C-alpha cells in the first residue's frame, strides 16, 4: 500500500529498469514489463517517468491507451519494446485480436489497483493476468489494502506476496491551506467560483464537477465571464485530453 506522494512509481520503475539492463536480451522482442493503470493520463505519466529514468539507455517504452488511433500503436506491434504501460480496455482488445504478445512478460505491475477495482476492471485485469501466466513477478500497488474487495483481489492474483506499506509524509501536508465555502444557492456558488478564479494567486486551478455534461456548461459560463479555461472529460479524444493537460502545465 502506498498513498499518493510516497514515490511508488520510482520505487517500481527503478528495479525493473535495472533488471532489464542487467539481463539484456540478445535480440528485440515483445515487452518484458507490463504496467497497467486505471486511466490514460496516469499511463502517459508513468511512461514519461520511465523514459526520464531510462534516458541514455537502449530501453524502449511505449503506451497503449484508449482514445488513440489504431495506427499510433504500430510501435508496440513491431515487437521492439521493453516496457509497455497500458490501460486495461484497449490492451485487452489487442490481446483478443492477437496484436499483442504477452508471452515475454516477466513482470506485471498493477498501479492504483484500488481505483481499477472501483472502475470495474477486475475481470479485465484477471484476464490479462491469465495471458501473462509465464511471468516471474507481480506487483500490486494500492492507496490502501483495507477492505475485503482489494484483499480478495490481491489473493487471487498474488502468490505468497510480501506486503509493504509506505507511510505518507506529513511534512508536505503542512504547506497545504484548505478553505470551506458555503453557498446559498447555485447562482451564489457560481459567482463565488468566478470571484475565486479571478484572484491574482489563482494561477493554475482545477475545478471538479460531478457530471460530464456539467463540465461543458461550466466551461462556457467561465469563458463568458472572461476566465480562460479548458476542460477534460472521459469522452474526449486523447489528443484533446493531452492538449488540455499541457495547457494547464504550461500555465
Enumerate the predicted regions with their spans.
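Conserved helicase RecA-like core
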Residues: 1-251
Amino acid at each position: 500500500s502506498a498513498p499518493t506522494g510516497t514515490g511508488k512509481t520510482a520505487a517500481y520503475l527503478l528495479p525493473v529498469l535495472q533488471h532489464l539492463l542487467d539481463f539484456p536480451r540478445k535480440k528485440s522482442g515483445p515487452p518484458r514489463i507490463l504496467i497497467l493503470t486505471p486511466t490514460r493520463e496516469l499511463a502517459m505519466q508513468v511512461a514519461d517517468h520511465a523514459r526520464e529514468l531510462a534516458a541514455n539507455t537502449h530501453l524502449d517504452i511505449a503506451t497503449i491507451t484508449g482514445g488513440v488511433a489504431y495506427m499510433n500503436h504500430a510501435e508496440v506491434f513491431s515487437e521492439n519494446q521493453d516496457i509497455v504501460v497500458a490501460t486495461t480496455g484497449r490492451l485487452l482488445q489487442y490481446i483478443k485480436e492477437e496484436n499483442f504478445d504477452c508471452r515475454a512478460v516477466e513482470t506485471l505491475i498493477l498501479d492504483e489497483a484500488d481505483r481499477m477495482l472501483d472502475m470495474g476492471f477486475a475481470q479485465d485485469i484477471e484476464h490479462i493476468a491469465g495471458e501473462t501466466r509465464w511471468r516471474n513477478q507481480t506487483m500490486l500497488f494500492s492507496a490502501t489494502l483495507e477492505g475485503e474487495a482489494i484483499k480478495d483481489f490481491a489473493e487471487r492474483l498474488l502468490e505468497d506476496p510480501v506486503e509493504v506499506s509506505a507511510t505518507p509524509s506529513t511534512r508536505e501536508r503542512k504547506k497545504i491551506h484548505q478553505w470551506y465555502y458555503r453557498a446559498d444557492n447555485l447562482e451564489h456558488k457560481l459567482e463565488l467560483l468566478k470571484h475565486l478564479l479571478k484572484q491574482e494567486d489563482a494561477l493554475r486551478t482545477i475545478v471538479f464537477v460531478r457530471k460530464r455534461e456539467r463540465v461543458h456548461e461550466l466551461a462556457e459560463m467561465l469563458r463568458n465571464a472572461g476566465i480562460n479555461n479548458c476542460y477534460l472529460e472521459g469522452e474526449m479524444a486523447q489528443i484533446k485530453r493531452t492538449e488540455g493537460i499541457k495547457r494547464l502545465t504550461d500555465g
